[in-house]
Structure formats: structure tokens, C-alpha cells
Amino acid sequence: MTGSRRALFLCLLGLGACAATPMETAFLPEFRGFVSIDPVRHSIEQGADMITHRNRLVGQPWETARLVQALEFLAVEVPNGPRWNVMLPMAQLTMPAARAEWRQGFGIAPEARAQEVIDSLTEFRSAFAEQRPAAAPAALRAPLFSPGGQETLNRFADPPALPRTTRALLDARQELISQSFERRAGRNFIIR
């Protein structure tokens, strides 16, 4: 009896150790301290607009970096955020699935954590904002970015077509729109 309890305890302890892997989290620096702006909603709406008008991104690597920051944030927040797994059931599947496409397109290491990518791109964007474009390639260092430096900057200046990512963002935006419509339509619902 005691031996079987001990075995059960050790088995449960082993299972608990497997489940203890921390969930990946990410945040966008421009939303730090803002309570009234929903960073997920904003990232989906702005990202969908940016990715469907790729011509606006050509020659503006800092804007492409902003898009990639939003994508990295969404790939982590939508499936892991407690609110979004109910509100955006398709996006919680399609955003992480599209992640491999944009990471390959921009030379981002497949195993990189989202926050590392976001922080590096914040440094990249800051170099342009501070009118130090010569410092921007240094923020795109290997092994986080491959090959890194100026070659990676060139990818951001002329972003590749990302059909799977585009579809994921457009679907997420549609889910947001339908959620907003359902909430508005439900306001006038009266039970008699």
C-alpha cells in the first residue's frame, strides 16, 4: 500500500515537472502604461492594414519592423491570453501557424522568443527615430537574425509577400469585427 502511494506520488511529481514549462509572454513597448488601448485589437487592425498595403512598407524598414513586432506579439498573446482564446478561436490557431512564414521571410531564428525579437526591433526602430540609420543594422544581430545586419535590413526595406500571414491577420480582423457586431446586437436583446 505504501509503495503504491509512493509510486503514484512520484508519477504525479514527474508529470507536474513536465507541465511546469513557463508560458511564453510578450508585450509591445509602445503600450506600456496605457490602459485604454487594447494592444491585441490595435495590432490586429494595424497589422491587417499594413500587410494588405505592402507598397507602403517598401523603403520604410522601421514600419515593417513595427508590423513584425505586432505579429510576434499576436503569435504569443492570442493563443495564451485568457480573453482571446474565446473571442478569437481561429486566430489562436492561424497566428502561431503563420509565424514560421514571417520568420523565414525576415530571417528570424525559428527558436527565438517573441520578446527577444520585439526588443531587437525596438532598438532597430529607435535608431531610425533618433535619425541614426547607420546604427540600425547593429540591432539586427545574428543569431537572432540571419544573416543579420545590412542584409536583414534590406529584407525589412523590401518585405516579402506573406500569404499565410496575410490570411491569418485578415481572419483575425474579421473575428474582431464579428465579435463587435454580436456585442452591439446583443445590447437590445430583451426577454419578456
In which residue ranges do the predicted regions lie?
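Short, solvent-exposed mixed-charge patches
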Residues: C18, F189-R192
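Mature extracellular/secreted ectodomains of secretory-pathway proteins
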Residues: M50-F189
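Bacterial Sec signal peptide processing site at the extreme N-terminus
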Residues: L15-V35
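Short terminal alpha-helical segments
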Residues: V40-R54
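N-terminal secretory signal peptides that target proteins for export/translocation
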Residues: M1-T2
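N-terminal export leaders
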Residues: R5-F9, C18
